[in-house]
């Protein structure tokens, strides 16, 4: 029974680190409309921000209770504050990092850009998390051996 407390700590730490949900607040958007200014060059959209992009007024809003579902809204050309009811809207989910979203007659390609958990985190964050998990496991193992 010496191992009970360290083993429970290890299990809780593993569950906590594996349940960390990926969050998104930036999206790179292109569309297939030949007259659009963002056919080849992606435009960056931010969550909860009314922006002029791809020849339209757009905003992306998070769906309550989800870290990966969003509502993509298109507004009339004069509604630069996104104050009126959207002219078109559709919900999308960031699953594989890339989604196709049809809004009105336009289909947008949306690349979901994962948030960084801190400013020093780089694109190699997966290997950093693996290293941290290994260190946590080693610490728990050492504490079990010390008992």
From Swiss-Prot:
Belongs to the ponticulin family. The GPI-like-anchor contains a phosphoceramide group, rather than a phosphatidyl group. Keywords: Cell membrane, Glycoprotein, GPI-anchor, Lipoprotein, Membrane, Signal. Residues 1-20 form the signal peptide. Residues 119-147 form a propeptide. A lipid is attached at residue 118 (GPI-like-anchor amidated asparagine). It is found in: Cell membrane. Glycans are attached at residue 118. One of its GO terms (molecular function) is actin filament binding. This is Ponticulin-like protein C2. GO terms for cellular component: lamellar body; membrane; plasma membrane; side of membrane. It is a lipid-anchor; GPI-anchor.
């Amino acid at each position: 029974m010496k191992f009970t407390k360290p083993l429970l700590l290890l299990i809780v730490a593993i569950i906590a680190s594996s349940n960390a949900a990926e969050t998104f607040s930036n999206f790179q958007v292109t569309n297939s409309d030949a007259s659009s200014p963002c056919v080849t060059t992606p435009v960056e959209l931010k969550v909860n921000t009314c922006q002029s992009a791809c020849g339209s007024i757009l905003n992306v809003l998070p769906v309550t209770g989800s870290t990966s579902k969003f509502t993509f809204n298109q507004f009339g050309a004069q509604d630069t504050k996104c104050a009126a009811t959207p002219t078109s809207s559709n919900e999308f989910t960031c699953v594989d990092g890339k989604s196709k979203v049809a809004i009105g007659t336009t289909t947008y390609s949306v690349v979901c850009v994962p948030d960084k958990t801190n400013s020093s985190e780089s694109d190699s964050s997966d290997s950093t998390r693996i290293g941290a998990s290994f260190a946590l496991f080693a610490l728990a193992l050492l504490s079990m051996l010390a008992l």
